[in-house]
From Swiss-Prot:
This is Pirin-like protein CC_1473. Transmembrane segments: none annotated. Belongs to the pirin family. CDD domains: cupin_Yhhw_N (cd02910). It comes from the Bacteria. Pfam families: Pirin, Pirin_C_2.
Length: 232
């Protein structure tokens, strides 16, 4: 089953400095029938104006993954962590028992991100943050695991949940597959490009909730950049 969510039907808000679209209920957008997809709780599509951002604010008991589509995001938190994550790379934050952080676009151009929240396997624990560059060529034509709660994904950033976050790029006409498993919940968003997922067309920034599909087959109708969450 593929549940398509067109980008222009997503909830959202325009704060001037921040233009946000919400794949699931978030902040002022609330739909009791659209709260989550399995353990995936939030997928926000954010555009952040130059030299603006999110001032210090708290989080707890959530795995928060930021995928940078364009520009860069600079993170700073009360643990002393600081880092700049650029387009195509990810940062992860395990909020655990509580963390306070800020995220700013310190670049001269608009930064575009996907911010993904996944419920953890257990509450509490020491908070942590990490970021890592991923060679862009490695994900050409196939999915590469960027963040994972599984120990055998040794090259991925660790998260404390039964989930993976994956990225891929496809040239027009290319096809790739991913063995999801019928007991898993997948959510796929093309950051760019038009694709078909098991025969369902997705435009750029549309969402596709995927359940009861052992394997997903993605064909690029034009050059595409993909982000996939495989969650419980």
């Amino acid at each position: 089953m593929i549940d398509r969510k067109p980008f222009d039907k997503l909830g959202g808000a325009d704060h001037g400095w921040l233009k946000a679209k919400h794949h699931f209920s978030f902040a002022s957008y609330y739909d009791p029938n659209n709260m989550n997809w399995g353990a995936l709780r939030v997928w926000n599509d954010d555009e952040i104006a130059p030299n603006t951002g999110f001032p210090p604010h708290p989080h707890s008991d959530m795995e928060i993954i930021t995928y940078v589509r364009d520009g860069a995001i600079t993170h700073q938190d009360n643990l002393g962590n600081k880092g700049r994550t650029v387009a195509g790379d990810v940062q992860v934050m395990s909020a655990g028992s509580g963390i306070r952080h800020a995220e700013y676009n310190l670049e001269p151009e608009t930064t575009r991100i996907f911010q993904i929240w996944i419920e953890p396997k257990s509450f509490g624990g020491a908070p942590s943050w990490g970021s890592k560059p991923f060679p862009k060529g490695d994900r050409s034509g196939k999915f590469v695991t960027l963040a994972s709660g599984f120990s055998d994904d040794a090259d991925a950033l660790p998260i404390r949940t039964d989930a993976r976050v994956l990225g891929a790029t496809l040239k027009a006409g290319e096809t790739t597959t991913y063995a999801l498993g019928k007991d898993r919940s997948g959510y796929l968003v093309p950051a760019a490009g038009v694709v078909e997922v098991n025969g369902v067309r997705l435009n750029a920034r549309d969402g596709a909730g995927i359940k009861d599909e052992a394997v997903i087959t993605i064909t690029a109708l034009e050059d595409a950049e993909l982000v996939l969450v495989d969650a419980a």
